[in-house]
UniProtKB/Swiss-Prot annotation:
The keyword Flavoprotein appears for this protein: no
GO cellular component: cytosolic small ribosomal subunit
Subunit structure: Part of the 30S ribosomal subunit. Forms a tight complex with proteins S10 and S14.
Name of this chain's protein: Small ribosomal subunit protein uS3
Record key words, sorted: Ribonucleoprotein, Ribosomal protein, RNA-binding, rRNA-binding
Domain of life: Bacteria
Domain KH type-2: 40-110
Alphabetized PROSITE patterns for the sequence: KH_TYPE_2, RIBOSOMAL_S3
Lineage of source species: Bacteria, Pseudomonadati, Pseudomonadota, Alphaproteobacteria, Rickettsiales
Function, in words: Binds the lower part of the 30S subunit head. Binds mRNA in the 70S ribosome, positioning it for translation.
Any Pfam family: KH_2
One GO-annotated biological process of the protein: translation
Amino acid sequence: MGQKVCAHGFRVGPTLIKGWDSVLYAEKHYKTLFIQDLKIRDLINKGFNQAQVSRVLIERPSNKSIIISINAKKPNIIIGRNGSEIDKLKKAIEKMTFLKEVYINIHEVRKFNIDAAIVAQTIALQLEKRVSFRKAMKTAIQASLKQGGQGIRVSCSGRLGGAEIARTEWYIEGRMPLHTLRADIDYSTAEAITTYGVIGVKVWIYKGEYTENKRYN
């Protein structure tokens, strides 16, 4: 079971280690708010892809306000010069949600080598620059283990190296207890758009077992 399902979704819950990326309560308008959340994430991820966004947490404490927390490797790109970019983003979200109280919090990811989303995006960027997929994968694995990761698995699928037949190659180092619910495993995917076609990248990073001090929402 743990080998097949999403490692993040498998651990989402109030008593488990992972928290939801959208926090809201709605009886009748859930569908509308859910679509708004998807559009906001798409706007941030595509508009600031160079910032290497790790996570977008959207909270709606009331019907009149929205709080968006963005974790990124390069937060300065999102903020912009004198806050110009973040002001544009705020106005776009106000127009999209019809809310006047829009709050945006930006956090820098310091240990980016053990953040699955950033590692996957980094590998995808290297593949787009025609770096060897084996070199990109092995470099990511070494950097992750040096920064405190206890295990990492990287998978690349597609026409690797320009081959006519698509295939999947993966490397794993350290431990990867996917069946253990208390294991803190970060998982993410990315896509590399190459001249040969799309190459899919998947990353699993094991950071140790769950404790109360490590839990986040």
